[in-house]
């Protein structure tokens, strides 16, 4: 099929020469039946969701307005880290945490995979913007995809459509993001509800600011504005331009006196990031408003402070474990509708359900389409099942969430899921020590990434799967950001662990969720000079007396266990840090080695 015969290709609502040329090149390679330029309108949403219902990909939910359920192919349920590549020109620029292939070699392989891969399908062109569209220099992208599921998800997760195309004008720069599920259809061939391919590649070309994804229709592999652009490509941009692109929530903490602090926090997947982002404090008079639950782009303002903006427009949250106790604000957000649910379970009356949601039904249809009862062996919802919902529906959304200038960050938190060793909260001695804390962040593996659940792995700044360049250079970039700033204006860095267990290893000693507001209160009191801490070998840690425990029904000894710094446990941690740093090799900054030696000295090791 020549380009002349592909309907829609020549009806482009733009005169942007590079965009037109790229779209034509992709269409000629992938040979779709038609090309559709997405405008982001409500009509487009209606049309595509109806198409997806007819195709069997979506089921319309009876109990949530304008909301839909999808079940993926059981082989396509999570990010595939072993099929995710950073194809920098030089292998050393990808570093030890990324898979690398020579860019031309990768392009040759993927070009053959893309050849004819959209046959029988529609090619959608999605202009999108990460972050507010009225920013001085917005970060623009265009995703080409062959699945309407991606288009409607991008409606929720990004600012997209005609307004972005206008902003692109005739020659504005943009990130090229090419996606195909890799499932061409022969004439008369019946489609499947969730097309995908056993061969998967999620590839990034950081110097060229390009993303090529093939074979997966799932979330982060297919919604290329999310991890691919906002973290992997953006982290490379941030290194070059002197800012930070991070896997962080942004929250606004308001004291009873209406004093405001903005906090950014980095946690690996399934460690409570979304719950903290939408926290409902249990201590009287304190309030939280949300600005984002997953990604923060931070750059210095004219006043020398670090300002954060959330590049996304929606929440793409892990469903299991989300309920009216753990995250009432997420439940209120999705209850308003206009949402997509993938790989959760379906109730008999046309609603969604997942593990730990209130009121377990006696019968469900599980994510694989089978009958499910409480006696069933398998879980009804996949552990990495997701809701995709507009941020604008969040009842505690901070009005500043859409401000292109961002909000000034007072504190940065790092945290992971550790049963031992790491105390409830720990303040860094200074910025460089805080970078060391982030660089050595560790967590037990979760379901969001394929692999063995439960093993402890290093997850620097919760960015292990998302750093778009060499991890050692990434640490150096963090150190440089601190060196080039006025240290009095830098955010203070803290490390938290909500998941410490008692000696039996069975009970999590800190109640978490809304009670985490007590830890946030201590943190902002530290910022304001109104709270004490004890200097320990690992940082500044409060005693139980220094945290507001009023009205908390957790035994004091449990709080003390949560805060305890066990020197012997920390000595056992040292070889693990040593091994991690050794794996990074020559690119590890000397400052990180210095911090490690200083920690050893303080521990008497």
Curated annotation (Swiss-Prot):
Q: Where is the active site?
A: 271
Which biological pathway?
Answer: Carbohydrate biosynthesis; gluconeogenesis
Kindly list the positions annotated as binding substrate. Answer: 79, 218-220, 269, 384-386
In this chain, Mn(2+) is annotated as bound at 227, 247, 294
Region spans: Disordered: 364-385
Cofactor(s) needed by this chain: Mn(2+)
Q: Which residues bind GTP?
A: 270-275, 386, 417, 513-516
Q: What class of enzyme is it?
A: lyase
Q: Where in the cell is it found?
A: Cytoplasm
> What catalytic activity does the UniProt entry give for this protein?
oxaloacetate + GTP = phosphoenolpyruvate + GDP + CO2
Q: Which GO terms describe its cellular component?
A: cytosol
Per the UniProt record, one Pfam family is PEPCK_GTP
> Which GO biological process categories is it annotated with?
cellular response to glucose stimulus; gluconeogenesis; glycerol biosynthetic process from pyruvate; oxaloacetate metabolic process; propionate catabolic process; response to lipid; response to starvation
Coiled-coil regions in this chain?
A: none
Cofactor comment text: Binds 1 Mn(2+) ion per subunit.
Write out the biased-composition intervals (Basic and acidic residues).
Answer: 364-381
Q: List the GO molecular function terms.
A: GTP binding; manganese ion binding; phosphoenolpyruvate carboxykinase (GTP) activity
Q: Which domain of life is it from?
A: Bacteria
Task performed by this protein: Catalyzes the conversion of oxaloacetate (OAA) to phosphoenolpyruvate (PEP), the rate-limiting step in the metabolic pathway that produces glucose from lactate and other precursors derived from the citric acid cycle.
- Name the family the entry cites: Belongs to the phosphoenolpyruvate carboxykinase [GTP] family.
Classification via PANTHER family: PHOSPHOENOLPYRUVATE CARBOXYKINASE (PTHR11561), PHOSPHOENOLPYRUVATE CARBOXYKINASE [GTP]-RELATED (PTHR11561:SF0)
What NCBIfam families is this protein classified in? PRK04210.1 (NF003253)
Q: How does it assemble?
A: Monomer.
**Protein name, entry field:** Phosphoenolpyruvate carboxykinase [GTP]
Tell me the organism: Saccharopolyspora erythraea (strain ATCC 11635 / DSM 40517 / JCM 4748 / NBRC 13426 / NCIMB 8594 / NRRL 2338)
Q: Which gene encodes it?
A: pckG
């Amino acid at each position: 099929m020549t380009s002349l015969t592909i309907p829609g290709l020549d009806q482009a609502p733009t005169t942007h020469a590079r965009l037109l040329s790229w779209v034509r090149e992709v269409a000629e390679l992938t040979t779709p039946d038609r090309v559709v330029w997405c405008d982001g309108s409500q009509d487009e949403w209606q049309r595509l969701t109806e198409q997806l219902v007819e195709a069997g990909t979506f089921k319309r939910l009876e109990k949530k307005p304008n909301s839909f359920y999808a079940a993926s192919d059981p082989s396509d349920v999570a990010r595939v880290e072993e099929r995710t590549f950073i194809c920098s020109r030089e292998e050393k620029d990808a570093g030890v945490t990324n898979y690398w292939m020579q860019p031309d070699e990768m392009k040759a392989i993927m070009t053959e995979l893309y050849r004819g891969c959209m046959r029988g399908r529609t090619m959608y062109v999605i202009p999108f913007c990460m972050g507010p569209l009225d920013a001085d220099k917005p970060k623009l992208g265009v995703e080409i995809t062959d699945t309407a599921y991606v288009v409607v998800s991008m409606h929720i997760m990004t600012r997209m459509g005609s307004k972005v195309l206008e902003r692109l004008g005739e020659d504005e720069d943009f990130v090229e993001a090419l996606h195909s599920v890799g499932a061409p259809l022969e004439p008369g061939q019946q489609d499947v509800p969730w097309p995908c391919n056993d061969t998967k590649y999620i590839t990034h070309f950081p110097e060229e600011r390009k993303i090529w994804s093939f074979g997966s229709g799932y979330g982060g592999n297919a919604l290329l504005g999310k991890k691919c652009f906002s973290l992997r490509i953006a982290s490379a941009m941030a290194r070059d331009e002197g800012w930070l692109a991070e896997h962080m929530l942004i929250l606004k903490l308001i004291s009873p006196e209406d004093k405001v602090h903005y906090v950014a926090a980095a946690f690996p997947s399934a460690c409570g990031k979304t719950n903290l982002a939408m926290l409902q404090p249990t201590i009287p008079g304190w309030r939280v408003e949300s600005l984002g639950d997953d990604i923060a782009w931070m750059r210095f303002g004219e006043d020398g402070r670090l300002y954060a903006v959330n590049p996304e427009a929606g929440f793409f949250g892990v469903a299991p474990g989300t309920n009216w106790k753990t995250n009432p604000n997420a439940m209120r957000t999705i209850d308003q509708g206009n949402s997509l649910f993938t790989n959760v379970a379906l109730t008999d009356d046309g609603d969604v359900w997942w593990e730990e949601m209130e009121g377990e039904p006696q019968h469900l249809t599980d994510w694989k389409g089978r009958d499910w009862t409480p006696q069933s062996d398998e879980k009804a919802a996949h552990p990495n099942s997701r809701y995709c919902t507009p941020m604008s529906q969040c009842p505690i959304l901070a009005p500043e969430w859409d401000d292109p200038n961002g909000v000034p960050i007072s504190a940065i938190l790092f945290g992971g899921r550790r049963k031992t060793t790491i105390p409830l909260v720990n303040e860094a001695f200074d910025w460089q020590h805080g970078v060391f804390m982030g660089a050595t962040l560790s967590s037990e593996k979760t379901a969001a990434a394929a692999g063995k659940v439960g093993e402890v792995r290093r997850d620097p700044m919760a960015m292990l799967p998302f750093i778009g360049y060499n991890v050692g250079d990434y640490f150096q970039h963090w150190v440089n950001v601190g060196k080039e700033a006025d240290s009095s204006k830098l955010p203070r860095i803290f490390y938290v662990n909500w998941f410490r267990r008692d000696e039996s290893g069975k009970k999590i000693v800190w109640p978490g969720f809304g009670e985490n507001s007590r830890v946030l209160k201590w943190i902002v009191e530290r910022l304001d000079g109104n709270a004490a801490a004890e200097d320990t070998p690992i940082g500044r840690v409060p005693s139980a007396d220094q945290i507001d425990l009023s009205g908390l029904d957790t035994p004091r000894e449990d709080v003390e266990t949560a805060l305890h710094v066990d020197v012997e446990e920390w000595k056992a941690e040292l070889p693990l840090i040593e091994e991690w740093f050794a794996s990074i090799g020559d690119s590890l900054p000397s400052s990180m080695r210095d911090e490690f030696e200083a920690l050893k000295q303080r521990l008497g090791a």
